[in-house]
Amino acid sequence: MGQGPSGGLNRQGDRKPDGGEKKEKKFEPAAPPARVGRKQRKQKGPEAAARLPTVTPSTKCKLRLLKLERIKDYLLMEEEFVANQERLKPQEEKAEEDRSKVDDLRGTPMSVGNLEELIDENHAIVSSSVGPEYYVGILSFVDKDQLEPGCSILMHNKVLSVVGILQDEVDPMVSVMKVEKAPLESYADIGGLEAQIQEIKEAVELPLTHPELYEDIGIKPPKGVILYGEPGTGKTLLAKAVANSTSATFLRVVGSELIQKYLGDGPKLVRELFRVADDLSPSIVFIDEIDAVGTKRYDANSGGEREIQRTMLELLNQLDGFDSRGDVKVILATNRIESLDPALLRPGRIDRKIEFPLPDIKTRRRIFQIHTSKMTLAEDVNLEEFVMTKDEFSGADIKAICTEAGLLALRERRMKVTHVDFKKAKEKVMFKKKEGVPEGLYM
């Protein structure tokens, strides 16, 4: 009892570890928590290099999503279109009802008359082709801005009130005369004729492009020119080159088109032609074969000849009347200038006369070069033999010779034109020319 505490216990009353018991574990800090959502790096090695990559159908899903979005857009557009149609349907029905009311007020049939004088916004004096003049009213739905003295109007069949305006439309024949597409021929396609090109530029092109030059020098530009010469010398070709080089409206008409069947239609067509040219100014009016209507006036024995003379008188009036032509230039062409009426050729109407002679040696050489530039010629071809010939060639004859020589080469299945082909072509063209033209016609 008197013994002290046992040596096996420590100060706190715990038993000291014996040598045979395990020692306590050392304190180790807890491992940090793994990061969520972070992709762990894969160990690189020989196994990773040999492993195939994982492929997911992400591209197909994106394409399908894009397709569905596009379909949705189309469906939304269709829905909006259907909604607009339903909303506009009552308005269309109302507009149709208003149109039917206007038709009932106009009545059928309607008379055609002329507006003589506009009294006020609601009343006017009108006349018909047969009968006296009337003081009538103007219905409220008529466009007052288009009413002007002299215009054609529609009148009620019974009360003769103004119910509409008859629009003055362009004659279909005149609309056909307008050259919509510029010709492909240019001044570079014309062999020679340098003096003629210079004259027509001064008389036709320069007044339209630079009118201030004529004002500064104090002269009036020419109103028109006439191109005359033997057939095939390049008159129509030069007119096409003018149409190609200028931006003005080009109206082309053949003289025979101005001769109409019924009385008064020819002068009316001439007036309509120049009215359209004035509306579309700056413009150029080209009348080919003017000798069809511009021949010398004699005592006419038939109604047809008198109608041709009336057409020519209207043409004279349009060329040099009280109304100034302004930016409208006239080009006439003929190969029989001696048969034209002197009144048509006097200065003031046609201020410049341009002659087209047969080509000389220099011009022939240039024309042959133009027409053979795209042809495949053999080495034995000598064009100087045809240039220096004494036969009278026109530009059209030279073109016909080149074309005929090419056809002869094609007939023999050859891709090159030889000198013999040109000789045969020349003989053929000259034979047809001498056979087809009456002797002494162009002397």
Swiss-Prot record:
SMART domains: AAA. There is a cross-link at residues 296, 433 (Glycyl lysine isopeptide (Lys-Gly) (interchain with G-Cter in ubiquitin)). It is found in: Cytoplasm; Nucleus. GO terms for biological process: female gamete generation; maintenance of root meristem identity; male gamete generation. Residues 12-28, 87-106 have a biased composition (Basic and acidic residues). Preferentially expressed in the root and shoot apical meristem. GO terms for cellular component: cytosol; mitochondrion; nucleus; proteasome complex. Component of the 19S regulatory particle (RP/PA700) base subcomplex of the 26S proteasome. The 26S proteasome is composed of a core protease (CP), known as the 20S proteasome, capped at one or both ends by the 19S regulatory particle (RP/PA700). The RP/PA700 complex is composed of at least 17 different subunits in two subcomplexes, the base and the lid, which form the portions proximal and distal to the 20S proteolytic core, respectively. This is 26S proteasome regulatory subunit 4 homolog B. It comes from Arabidopsis thaliana.
